[in-house]
Amino acid sequence: MRDPVSSQYSSFLFWRMPIPELDLSELEGLGLSDTATYKIKDSSVGKMIGQATAADQEKNPEGDGLLEYSTFNFWRAPIASIHSFELDLL
């Protein structure tokens, strides 16, 4: 008899909603039309797999503005400023 706990129908991956395909026209409406910095793995799946090469990044030296607001940079504690006279006290 089948174990109901390990059944494929009880898994999260079976019951979750599929990720919708990315519509590039919606990105243009938001002002994020610079999609050349990403390579599309498979157009039928619509997954982004990585950033552009170094030659493409030289063309755009300011980089992607959204990378500044990643979850790591946004939620980390600010670096404490230590002055030279405080270092002398240590």
Curated annotation (Swiss-Prot):
Instruction: Specify whether Secreted is a keyword of the entry.
Output: no
Q: Which family does it belong to?
A: Belongs to the MLLT11 family.
Q: Which Pfam families match?
A: WRNPLPNID
Spell out the subcellular localization from the entry.
Answer: Nucleus; Cytoplasm; Cytoplasm, Cytoskeleton, Microtubule organizing center, Centrosome
Name-wise, this protein is Protein AF1q
Q: Which residues carry this modification: Phosphoserine?
A: S84
Its ancestry begins with: Eukaryota, Metazoa, Chordata, Craniata, Vertebrata
Disulfide connectivity?
Answer: none
Q: What does this protein do?
A: Cofactor for the transcription factor TCF7. Involved in regulation of lymphoid development by driving multipotent hematopoietic progenitor cells towards a T-cell fate.
Query: Its Gene Ontology biological processes?
Result: extrinsic apoptotic signaling pathway; intrinsic apoptotic signaling pathway; positive regulation of apoptotic process; positive regulation of DNA-templated transcription; positive regulation of mitochondrial depolarization; positive regulation of release of cytochrome c from mitochondria
Motif Nuclear export signal residues? 24-32
